[in-house]
Amino acid sequence: MNELINICTKNTRLSKAQIEYLDKISLLFPFIADISYSQVTMYVRDRVKSLIIVAQAKPHTSFFQYKPNSIGSMAKGSEEPLIWRTFRFAKHIQGKREWAVGLLLDMYTFPLYDSNGEMVAVICFETNY
């Protein structure tokens, strides 16, 4: 079982079909990261409404300072306000994030819906391009 499926099965209320849908989308992340010159990250809500990173890809087309793999890590809404607002209001949001001291990145968040119109994840693009 791959990591995304394992994390979602253990920590979320997503259905098997929703998890498989997210898994298929995550397979495109390396390509999406390269053509968007962005780090691409997928967040889902866990059972207690914290956020979990379930997929991530860094671009090969632009330089990003080293940041450890965050897959499986959890965050509270206060730690990821743009992600949380995207979950709450189901709208695309643009903002900034401090990647390291003094280094701001542009951040774009998008809600991701399943075939029934239910929001299942947020995809975030972070770029310094």
What are these regions (language model features)?
Residues M1, Q18-I19, K49-V54:
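Short, functional N-terminal and low-complexity linear motifs
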Residues M1-N2, I7-Q18, V122-Y129:
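Juxtadomain coupling helices with adjacent low-complexity linkers
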Residues L4-I7, N11-L14, L22, Q65-P68, ...:
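Generic, low-specificity signal for short hydrophobic/alpha-helical stretches with a mild N-terminal bias
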Residues A17, S70-G72, R97:
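A generic structural signal for short
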Residues I19-A33:
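Short amphipathic alpha-helical segments
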Residues F29-H92:
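Structured interaction and signal-relay segments at domain junctions
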Residues K76-Y129:
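Sensory/regulatory domains in signal-transduction proteins
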